[in-house]
Amino acid sequence: MALGAFKLDEALRSLDAVQLAKVSGRLVRVSGMLLESLGCRRMTGQRCLVEQADGSLLEAQVVGFNRDITYLMPFKKPMGLTAGSRVFPAEEETALRIDDSWLGRVVNGLGEPLDELGKLTGRDLLPTELPRVNPLKRRPVTEALDVGVRAINALLTVGKGQRVGLFAGSGVGKSVLLGMITRQTKADVVVVGLIGERGREVQEFILHSLGEEGLRKAVVVVAPANESPLMRLKAAELCHSIAAYFRDQGNDVLLLVDSLTRYAMAQREIALALGEPPATKGYPPSVFGMLPELVESAGNGADARGSLSALYTVLAEGDDQQDPIVDCARAILDGHIVLSRRLADVGHYPAIDISASVSRCMNQVSAMPQQRAARNFKELYSTFEKIKELIPLGGYTPGMDAKTDRSVQLAPALERFLRQEVGEGSELGVSLATLQSILK
């Protein structure tokens, strides 16, 4: 009897080792980066594994469905897929855990390390969804943020918790100015999202803009242009979740995203592949729904401790300030700094067009004397810009208008104030004192 029971237990244990049949589907169509499968039903947002020709498994996410067809978008470029390739439901994704050990690390859009410094661990759970803050509980912007750039500190003062866009065409100096702000801004934690940009710039930004000292207090999330659109979306959302985590720990956080336009382009690729109709300049409606959701996840939280200031670069294609993404970003951000190609072409750096730029939180974080001085500076600079081309032609006669005379007299000082070397810093107090000394 005992021997029979022993053999039965042994037989039952051997059954546990038998691999049972897996639920699977099959690929029926591949179009670009969009995969269509039949028979593997998953909810949107869940993941599947697609078997490739060499036996490796390609991870993909469900982005939509049509009756029995499930639409998948892979995280990496597919290699060796065939009609009928098997599709398996992936196990539940492991939640990311985070703490201060993430500082100094470089990761991809899935939170996987790229710096070969070992696996990332942590004590706290990092939410997979974008953080949300009740608008009635969000702490207002009341304190100025020193970014170390004279023109911004004095004329376009930003606050802790403000979200600002850096608008410019290609090759006008967005990344250079972003690097200046990264080095000069006093923040406890810096979170950098390099989304859809050139891979060459990743190492350059880490070495030159952050530096060894800056990297110690930073987390860099990378998804260069050769990554799949889904990975670019994930990277942008991940850096916002990381920044919100450190904000809620009581830190003053600076979030830098380069660029918001590439995030919109990634969503455009996915939406068009799914058959969504294009609208303005080829951007489907879903793009303009996702941008506010991303931006609103930044900013101050409900807690009295900590802040999250965000700076987004926005590419104005063809220097068009009415580009749909530029226009949308201008509406949802708390301010915008416009870089001018005309200024960049004459060697004026940073090429900030102060007449076209605005900080919507400046009145909340600056005193009235500074606001008056900034308005006076802009007025004088704008007046000189209007008549400077007439001066060599003899079209300007001194004594005809006092304001014009004063703008011409102060023009060299105004120009010097707006220019700043890449390695030069200008603290907030020094910037304000210099502004007052010019206008006295």
Model-derived regions: residue spans:
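N-terminal accessory targeting/assembly segments
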Residues: M1-R105, L110-L114
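Phosphate-interacting basic helix/loop segments used at nucleotide- and nucleic-acid interfaces
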Residues: K7-L12, F88-A90, V147-I152, C239, ...
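Residue-level signal for beta-strand positions within conserved beta-sheet cores that form or flank
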Residues: V23, L58, A83, W102, ...
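A generic structural signal for well-ordered coil/turn residues at beta-strand boundaries
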Residues: V23, S31, T44, W102, ...
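Flexible glycine-/small-residue-rich
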Residues: R29-S31, G39, Q52-D54, G64, ...
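Active-site phosphate-binding and catalytic loops of NTP-dependent enzymes
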Residues: S56-E59, T94-I98, P113-K119, L136-T142, ...
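P-loop NTPase nucleotide-binding/switch module
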Residues: S85-V87, T94, L114-Q162, S175-M180, ...
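P-loop NTPase catalytic core
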Residues: A154-L155, G161-K440
